[in-house]
């Protein structure tokens, strides 16, 4: 039996300290059981436009063509035109976006690292800090309390599965002023 590898590469362009994110496609042969999914959502800030692509073995082309034709039909015209512009002219936008996320990451990492109850790894990609908070056994309750008391929205780690319990996720895709303000509000809660 063949085991299929489904690779989510939606955040692959949002990497900070390497030239590019590793991909199974770099080592797979064309007919290997690997399907990589990608999207315009993250790299080109087209979230909600529902446009992406996949890379799959050529022998599966007809299968995906039928799925698309009968289940999806096709994306609206303006979204297709936007995707063409993103591919043709969007590299500067991606670079600037990644640089902004890098600044946000650095600010958030520096501030969270100084909070006594917080333990986190240095984020290498995307725009999230996923951190453990000492003494927490209900991340949803903590996220709700922090939202109620500080106005800062965090995702509870439990939303990502049982092993995420005790963690929180913070998005640093925001301006430095917004992030600094959020860190100021979080500090009393996480110290």
Which role does the model predict for each range below?
Residues 1-191:
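PLP-dependent class I/II
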């Amino acid at each position: 039996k063949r085991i299929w590898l489904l690779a989510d590469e939606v955040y692959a362009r949002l990497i900070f300290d390497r030239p590019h994110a590793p991909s199974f496609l770099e080592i797979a042969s064309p007919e290997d059981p690997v399907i990589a999914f990608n999207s315009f959502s993250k790299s080109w800030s087209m979230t909600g436009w529902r446009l992406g692509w996949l890379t799959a073995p050529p022998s599966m082309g007809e299968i995906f063509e039928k799925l698309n034709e009968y289940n999806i039909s096709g994306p609206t015209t303006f979204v297709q035109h936007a995707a063409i512009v993103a591919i043709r002219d969007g590299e500067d936008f991606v670079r600037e976006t990644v640089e902004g996320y890098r600044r946000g990451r650095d600010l958030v990492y520096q501030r969270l690292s100084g909070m006594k109850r917080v333990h986190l790894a240095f984020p290498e990609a995307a725009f999230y800090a996923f951190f453990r908070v000492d003494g927490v056994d209900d991340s949803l309750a903590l996220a709700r309390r922090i939202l109620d008391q500080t106005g800062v929205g965090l995702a509870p780690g439990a939303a990502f599965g049982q092993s995420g319990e005790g963690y929180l996720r913070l998005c640093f895709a925001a301006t430095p002023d917004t992030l600094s303000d959020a860190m100021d509000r979080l500090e009393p809660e996480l110290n």
